[in-house]
Amino acid sequence: MLKGRYIFSENGKEIYRSENVVTLYGKRFLTNFIAGNIIDYRKDLAFGIDSTAAVDNDTRLGFEFYRIPVEFGTTDIYSDDNGIKYFVVYKTVLPVDLAGVIKEVGTYPSRRTSSNSFDSKFISDFSDSFAWRDSESFNPERSSTGALIGEDVLSFTSGVGTEKEYFCTITESDFSGYSVNDSIRLSYYKNDNNLEKIKIRFYSSDIAYYEVEINDNSGTGNKISDDILLSVLYAGANSENPDISKINKIGIVVVPKTGLQSTVGMDGLRINDEDSFDPTYGLISRSVLSTPLTKVIGRLVDVEYRMELSF
């Protein structure tokens, strides 16, 4: 039987622990590792903001925002009244300049055996207000309200009864290697009940873009969109024939309800590779914290993953 837990400590004192689920991939990975079929022993710990319950068929964190290599791996063997216990232990340290609300944590191998230029990644973490502008070249304001990734969100505000778009110019990027089964997700903070929907646009020129919509008519507070398949994005091409291999700008449109104005705090936008197969790479373990752990700048936090092996 495999059991594991993640332990968070500060200044040598434990501040939190959370039990994990070893995934189906994790069980295969460990079996292959013992058999000598996996040579690279290095691991990463990943941290995210999604609180969806962990299950053994998880293939990734719900919404990852930070990943760091394991600094130290060892074993721990001791006996108690219940017999001898065997542990594999991985340790790392969250740096002082990291800020975020940790709701989930997972373990991955550090490397793939196959090359993949279209991996899961951030499109934007909305950390730079000067990178975004509206049609009049005004930058959005920063706000600490609702921030899960970093210390702030960017406040995107609509007009009164009219939609408003914010743009971010990026280095021309080729998204053509992502399949229709891959997905994007948006993390945001809904400040009011005046929001009708959010549009996300991927531009290959000033007039040619792909578009998806997030309809939101329920409550306020922190939100993570459902997985939006890229098949939906590709189907949302406008009539100007956009080119998915030459994306150079991202647009986000805030659409308010009739006669109202809405402000949305933008927190993170990710693209997730859902269907690339690598027999030596995947999510080994995932844990969802029952109470989120807030990591603030200026504070070192030690993280330890202890996997118990029963023979």
Regions inferred by a protein language model and the residue ranges of each:
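Beta-rich carbohydrate-recognition modules and glycan-binding surfaces
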Residues: S115-F277
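Small cysteine-rich, disulfide-bonded extracellular modules of the LU/uPAR three-finger superfamily
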Residues: M1-K103, Y108-S124, F130, E136, ...
